Amino acid sequence: VRLLRAHPGEYLSGQEISTSLKISRAAVWKHVEHLRAAGFEIAARRAQGYCLRSLPDLLLADDIMRDLATKVVGREIDCLKQLSSTNLIAREAAAAGAPEGLVVLADSQSAGRGRLGRNWTSPEGVNLYASVLLRPQLSPLDAPQLTFLSAVATAEVLDEVCGLNARVKWPNDVLVNGRKIAGLLNELGAETEQIHFLVLGIGLNVNMSADQFPADLRYPATSVMLETGTTQARLPLVRALLRRIDELYHDLLAEGFGPLRRRWEARFDLLDRQVEVDQGQQIITGVVAGLDADGALRLFLPDGRSQRILVGDVRPIGR
């Protein structure tokens, strides 16, 4: 692929490719057929050779890393066709000593997960399934701040790359027109006073069609394609996302949670509104005051008291 891409619009003879790759002409033909089966459009002409006409929407580490210019995120990138869960692979890599900034991407997942262990539908070749390994010098109590970092990065990139008006939902969703377009799942490896690693997991619906969503979804869902009416190449989206995560991560460590919290709250439509929080065993009503430093949602209750919300589904009351 690299050889053909280095000569766009040009024909390379089978002999040139054979010599460059140190393989037989028969092996060249087999490689070309394999690439065609994977979606690469490769023209062939007698006495001229092969020419790459178009690429499938594949995520390749070399393409993502080329001129990425990040400080931490993307130092190492693993792109896999199919796996159980990008978060699981990233956690295993973290335990084995992988460097901060490792990114694990998959074309599909067989065991993608959301918050509270809920299944995350992960069809092949249409979405972004990504995990970023970080080793922040933060207290474990501050680890939830990274969930809001993921949300802000995802929402801002959806606006800038896709022309959407993305909003955030506490604690870990990104919405467009009231429908869920991305979910976030961060997983922590820590002791009482030290974070060993933190994995940022992001599932972003890019080119998913309406019939690919399960019928039993808890909340309405959407994708970039459904919102814009056109397919979106995933490469520019993932590159922009990794750059924004890197930028926000650097700012968080240098400036604290305040600036990031303000960017998140600016996209949170329930700020200063009356809501109810369904915690399963009880429903709490109040007015949203904002986020605490540990990511808890703070409510003003009807009796004037303030209460921190650590878990629950938040819904607006009235308009």
Range-by-range predicted roles:
Residues V1-E160, K180-A182, G189, Q232:
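N-terminal lobe of the biotin/lipoate ligase/transferase fold
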Residues V28, T86, A130, D173, ...:
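Residue-level signal for inorganic ion chemistry
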Residues V168-N172:
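Alpha/beta catalytic cores of group-transfer enzymes, especially the acyltransferase/condensing modules
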Residues V1-I23, E33, A37, L138-P144, ...:
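Long, positively charged amphipathic alpha-helical accessory segments at protein N-termini or as interdomain linkers
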Residues Y50, D173-V174:
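Hydrophobic residue at the +6 position relative to the catalytic HRD Asp in the kinase catalytic loop
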